[in-house]
């Protein structure tokens, strides 16, 4: 089985090293194509206004000056000797839950793999943002190999990929695995204005207190219960339930 690894935290990220160890428990044909620099929050973006610079760092290991989407495209269309059987994106430092998935470069790596018809999983490890708290990488490293092996035996529909989130706890405290839906999260974003040395303003986006929907069955609620969240997502964003409502309203307007 050929496995392609990518991420959005960059080629030297701890989470990518963890993901490589996970992948090598499943296969000896592992390829890594990851961004040269941190690409967090760039979602499913392409680099179209400047060239893509590629560096080989070792056997089947490459750093690309581009986004996670660029990395998957470069790997599948240029570098690999054949299409991979699995794309793993991550392991992200921090959970990708609820509305996070629309911003996440980690999730975008799985999206692009799915665009190319390859089974794809995004992996993220939750942790406490309180100063002094480390990221419990041993949780995902302990539990992901068996979980991925089980998920590989499932025949997913075309256009579907999986978003895996691992809880912030000790490996032995993980209470199980839930198949979840996306929750709802308010990031509490604000815009902070500062002044540079020339007296000109510049701005930072800042996260405040996050408020969300923690009900059972959602990705957020599941992680709070120290359970692994597996959320099936799909490329098709069409809201089929609303199609007929809109069509009926438009037809009514035309006839009036």
From Swiss-Prot:
Its cofactor is a divalent metal cation. A divalent metal cation binds at residues 8-9, 40, 92. The keyword Metal-binding applies. GO terms for cellular component: cytoplasm. Binds 1 divalent metal cation per subunit. The keyword Ion transport does not apply. Keywords: Cytoplasm, Hydrolase, Metal-binding, Nucleotide-binding. GO terms for molecular function: 3'-nucleotidase activity; 5'-nucleotidase activity; exopolyphosphatase activity; metal ion binding; nucleotide binding. It holds the Pfam family SurE. It catalyses: a ribonucleoside 5'-phosphate + H2O = a ribonucleoside + phosphate. It is found in: Cytoplasm. InterPro entries: SurE, SurE-like_Pase/nucleotidase, SurE-like_sf. Its EC number is 3.1.3.5. SUPFAM superfamilies: SurE-like (SSF64167). Nucleotidase that shows phosphatase activity on nucleoside 5'-monophosphates. Belongs to the SurE nucleotidase family. This is 5'-nucleotidase SurE. It comes from Allorhizobium ampelinum (strain ATCC BAA-846 / DSM 112012 / S4) (Agrobacterium vitis (strain S4)). The lineage of its organism: Bacteria, Pseudomonadati, Pseudomonadota, Alphaproteobacteria, Hyphomicrobiales.
